[in-house]
């Protein structure tokens, strides 16, 4: 039935059952029904009286506004403070999508406090551009981001056309089957849901490599997965061609593969190969007759080779042994330095100890001997193996099936890997799609993409600015852990963590301190029992600690209290169906999310881990400390609804500073 005293014309109520009513807008033009609200009878009618639904005259988007929050015009009050948006005209503010009824209020704002008070009452797509203007972003950049239809004529009565411009807030259900699919979709489907505001980024053809930055929770991995699917769809008429989707760890590759299988059809998935880059390269080298075993630092054979090499250390320089391992990892390997002459010339920017050419000449025999020992043992480190893979593929004219490569967690992938990735596909449209965030770099790999032959400057660089996972309160806590730290943008420039925000709000993270482990564990158990009593599933809760040994202690305490746990090991996946509070290291939960996260044992000497920041080189120590801070930042941003942080004994300096 029609609601005659509704704020908007042509508003009707639909009876759902004896209690609930739906509020539906039926515009005069077109065969369109817009479900606006569902509530109990009286509340639904009250909502219809308070809310106006109109088409914005400039952006053409449909906006729903609660008119009870609009302040009536009043006599101007003389205020000494300058206006927040004094640099812009009312027409410019209107062009950003601000509803006409809010223009006067917005132009009168004097600070961000007043602006933040409008967040809950203005349409999100109207408030966000104002937030970015207040943060200092260029007006034209904000306009292009939020008003892509600015040059198109707008008919404020044509709701069917307006729907096409409003996909961020509205979805057109074409038939009953689609509606049922949406209503019955499992949680896993929503986890790979692409926000409509990101669809343009996913589906826009590119003339070359694209880099996408964004803070934790902004949907980078979801964007990457949808990009892979879009690229796969374009290969339907190109038999044998594939999309390579690569990430840094085996765990993340397994999680992404599982999510892509939920997102893609069987045919689309058959054209996407999801891999951990190290494992992929090792397999390819074996297939093409590579005669060396690829090893990591922990390998015993590699350790013996290194100890032999240290016998070449020039005692007169007085440098500690860890200087040589850091020099190898930070300078020699990433820059593919293979000769004394190359080492004398290579840039050492970022190292704390300056070296003359004479000192470099004395140091080089250590690295030369190490490579000789590794060659005798038929061993190769990953960096050398990647460099040799490029040469081998070229010499053997290896034809790989990939037309495009999608790279996730790019901040943890080093220069050797990116140089290899660049060599795997020819420079062409849609060749590379790279997503990452320097604020989440938890491994000691740093890259400047331009030095790897990957040009992402200018319009080839995009940034996601809305956090869809965590609350603003959790985001602020996590960002605060990195206060005062300069973070790179994967291409040698600085990236900010202040230009993204969360639209969700909740409780501030709960931080507790205990005198000993027993007291801390008891507090955690009590908090988890309260969550379980409120119908939170055990598998939606995760306790994470710095090390495996640490989280196993908490698991034991929970088990003793009758709470089931499930360990997320290095090579184990996470089945959402299996009950049990998830237990994991902070490294393991990278890329995952949980409704509630407990950061446990955040003690002095544990986070940051003492041995991780023990370098004698002040620059190395600074970088290692950043990795530890980033690790805590990453762990905190896994929480969707609530974050709990606890310590016992002396708390971590990261908590006290925070």
Where are these regions (language model features)?
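Enriched for short, Lys/Arg-rich terminal
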Residues: 12-133, 145
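A short, compositionally biased micro-patch
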Residues: 15-19, 27, 467, 592, ...
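ATP-hydrolysis module of ASCE/P-loop NTPase motor domains
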Residues: 76-133, 289-359
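A short, surface-exposed loop/turn module that caps and links secondary-structure elements
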Residues: 1-15, 575
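Accessory/regulatory regions of helicases
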Residues: 64-94, 98-105, 110-111, 125, ...
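Conserved helicase motor core of SF1/SF2 NTP-dependent helicases
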Residues: 191, 195-242, 248-293, 356-359, ...
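Accessory N-terminal region flanking or inserted into the helicase ATPase core
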Residues: 157-196, 203, 213, 319-403
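Interdomain "pre-motor" coupling segment immediately N-terminal to P-loop NTPase/helicase cores
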Residues: 115-174
């Amino acid at each position: 039935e029609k609601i005659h005293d509704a704020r908007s014309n042509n508003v009707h109520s639909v009876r759902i059952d004896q209690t609930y009513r739906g509020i539906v807008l039926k515009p005069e033009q077109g065969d369109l029904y817009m479900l606006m609200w569902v509530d109990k009878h009286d509340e639904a009618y009250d909502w219809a009286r308070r809310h106006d639904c109109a088409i914005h005259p400039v952006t053409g988007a449909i906006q729903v506004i609660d008119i009870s929050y609009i302040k009536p015009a009043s006599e101007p009050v003389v205020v000494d403070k300058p206006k927040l948006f004094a640099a812009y005209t009312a027409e410019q503010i209107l062009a950003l999508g601000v509803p006409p009824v809010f223009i006067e209020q917005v132009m009168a704002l004097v600070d961000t406090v007043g602006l933040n008070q409008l967040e809950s009452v203005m349409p999100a797509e109207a408030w966000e551009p104002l937030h970015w203007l207040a943060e200092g972003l260029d007006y034209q950049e904000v306009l292009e981001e939020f008003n892509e239809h600015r040059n198109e004529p707008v008919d404020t009565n044509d709701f069917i056309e307006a729907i096409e411009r409003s996909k961020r807030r509205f979805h057109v259900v074409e038939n009953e089957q689609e509606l049922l699919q949406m209503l019955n979709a499992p949680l896993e489907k929503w986890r790979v849901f692409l926000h409509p505001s990101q669809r343009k980024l996913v589906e826009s053809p590119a003339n070359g490599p694209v880099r996408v930055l964004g803070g934790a929770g902004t949907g980078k991995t979801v964007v990457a997965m949808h990009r892979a699917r879009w690229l796969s769809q374009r290969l339907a008429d190109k038999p044998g061609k594939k999309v390579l989707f690569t990430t840094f760890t085996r765990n993340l590759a397994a999680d992404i593969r599982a999510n892509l299988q939920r997102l893609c059809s069987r045919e689309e998935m058959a054209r996407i190969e999801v891999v951990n880059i190290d494992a992929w390269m090792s397999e390819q080298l074996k297939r093409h007759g590579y005669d060396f075993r690829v090893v990591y630092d922990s390998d015993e054979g590699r350790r013996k080779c290194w100890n032999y090499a240290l016998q070449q250390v020039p005692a007169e320089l007085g440098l500690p042994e860890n200087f040589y391992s850091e020099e190898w990892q930070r300078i020699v390997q990433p820059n593919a330095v293979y000769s004394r002459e190359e080492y004398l010339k290579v840039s050492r920017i970022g190292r704390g100890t300056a070296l003359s050419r004479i000192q470099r000449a004395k140091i080089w025999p250590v690295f030369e001997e190490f490579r000789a020992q590794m060659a005798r043992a038929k061993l190769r480190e990953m960096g050398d193996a990647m460099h040799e893979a490029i040469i081998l593929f070229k010499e053997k004219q290896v034809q790989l099936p990939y037309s495009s490569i999608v790279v996730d967690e790019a901040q943890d992938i080093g220069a050797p890997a990116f140089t290899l990735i660049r060599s795997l596909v020819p420079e062409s449209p849609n060749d590379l799609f790279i997503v990452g965030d320097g604020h989440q770099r938890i491994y000691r790999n740093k890259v400047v993409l331009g030095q790897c032959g990957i040009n992402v400057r200018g319009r080839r660089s995009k940034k996601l600015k809305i956090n869809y996972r965590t609350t603003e309160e959790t985001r602020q806590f996590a960002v605060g852990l990195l206060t005062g730290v300069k973070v790179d943008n994967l291409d040698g420039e600085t990236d900010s963590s202040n230009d993204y925000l969360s639209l969700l709000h909740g409780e501030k993270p709960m931080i507790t301190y205990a005198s000993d482990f027993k007291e801390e564990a008891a507090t955690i158990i009590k908090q988890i029992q309260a969550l379980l009593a409120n119908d939170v599933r055990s598998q939606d809760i995760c306790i994470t600690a710095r090390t495996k040994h640490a989280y196993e202690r908490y698991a034991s305490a929970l088990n003793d209290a009758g709470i089931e746990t499930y360990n997320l090991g290095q090579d184990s996946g996470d089945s959402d169906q299996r009950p049990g509070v998830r237990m994991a290291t902070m490294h393991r939960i990278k890329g995952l999310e949980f409704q509630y996260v407990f950061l446990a044992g955040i003690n002095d000497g544990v986070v940051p881990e003492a041995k991780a920041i023990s370098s004698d080189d002040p620059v190395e120590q600074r970088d290692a400390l950043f990795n530890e801070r980033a690790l805590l930042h990453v762990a905190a941003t896994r929480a969707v609804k609530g974050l709990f942080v606890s310590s016992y004994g002396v708390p971590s300096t990261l908590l006290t500073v925070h």
